[in-house]
Regions:
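Nucleotide-sugar donor-binding/catalytic module of glycosyltransferases
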Residues: 1-133
């Protein structure tokens, strides 16, 4: 069972998905499941994501990463996509990462360690906002 499952909705993020995926695949925590959910994006987001997956695939076995891309049958909106993604998860903990965001390489290991140490059902962290314009 993965320690953490990460749900990443995909829609109209071809400018951002590469940076997002790289930040996820460079996590220091092992045993992560990444569930990318394509909400019928009209742009090249999925093609870009697949290129990043191929680039990082050699490290997936070493880090025990599971990566999947699921496609919605029709554009359904963020809440429905998130719920569908969560329904596919098998990790001890589930988190979300928006596909126009990126995370520090130690984020999930820190959150997981706190959860284990405190026997928490939920952990939270701060974030920084940047102007992507």
């Amino acid at each position: 069972m993965p320690k953490v499952s990460v749900v990443i909705p995909i829609y109209g993020v071809e400018k951002y998905i590469e940076r997002c995926a790289v930040s996820l695949f460079e996590q220091t925590l092992h045993d992560i499941e990444f569930v990318f959910v394509d909400d019928c994006t009209p742009d090249h987001s999925i093609e870009i994501l697949k290129q990043v997956i191929e680039k990082y695939r050699p490290c997936f076995e070493e880090k025990n990463y599971a990566v999947r891309i699921e496609r919605m049958s029709s554009n359904s909106g963020l809440p429905t996509v998130r719920r569908h993604g969560v329904s596919l998860c098998s990790g001890e903990y589930v988190t979300h990462c928006d596909s126009d965001d990126w995370v520090a390489p130690y984020l999930y290991v820190m959150l997981y360690k706190v959860a284990m140490r405190t026997d928490a059902d939920m952990v939270m962290c701060g974030y920084n906002m940047t102007d992507g314009a």
